[in-house]
């Protein structure tokens, strides 16, 4: 039986409208809580790539094996590695290249759901690995594998740098990164390794285990904020917050805030009141228009923009927080050169009241590097879940220079029967 599904996407990115400091383990750790840095195009620039145990038959978009899914369960039809370093012996153990990046870069995320064997990681042509140990430990908690940090007590990384099966431990390298997995390909070996590839001239200082001691103050500061951003976040603005309060009638579009620039918003907090709150959060459209553009750089249902949907679902993160009382906060900075307007478009059939505030901050707009924050939404109705009628769902088409910072996806499935795999 087919099942109709609605797919709702909110996509956020910054778009572009000196001389860089060296990239170090410390600078990358500090960047994890530096939302202000997103206002300008990165220098040096980079692209992000991912090495993974995906089914390597899936190499031609729209081809016959595009949706092949033997992605690390073992005994894949096509080996899911970059190359074979050493063929397996009688015990079935071989050595396989799972990541190879030439040029300056940084590992920024690793993940596994299950993997046996060991990993060796080499930097910059060195013959001795900087890491040689458990693959599972490295892909879940890289920093912890290098031993205890002097002067640091407690589970510093758990729930902050390390979250469930993924880890966000920055590991930079100057010239090259090679990672070899030693294991049995007939056994489960799920892995993902996400790497920033910087432009060739980038000045990057290669990671050393001693960095964790050298930058322990940065680690402790970042860990504290990541553990509870809503409570521990520090805003840099010296300006006063500006209140928002409005009641929007059905069918009305109301301008609820206007600011002159150049400035940036460091915080946007809103709370919606309505008889049917779930409907109001979906049917009230948030628009943020910077510098008199003909349409808003931000256009999204208000609840979806903050990641609250459906209804109010509390969570606490650096870019967004949704509190149990319905207060929704965005910490993505929103720079503008001349003006900023916030409009609320009530497309529902009942009045909606919205309260909140913005925190403006000083900002110097640079025509070469400054970027507007953008977030757009789209809905695909009546999708059919079928193993025969599979299809790709392109959700971002962008031109020019910019930095992609995230996507929120909501699936509305009318089928009451739970299915394996979610």
Describe each PLM feature range:
Residues 6-16:
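Bacterial N-terminal signal peptides
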Residues 21-422:
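Beta-strand-centric surfaces of beta-sandwich/beta-rich domains
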Residues 1-2:
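N-terminal secretory signal peptides that target proteins for export/translocation
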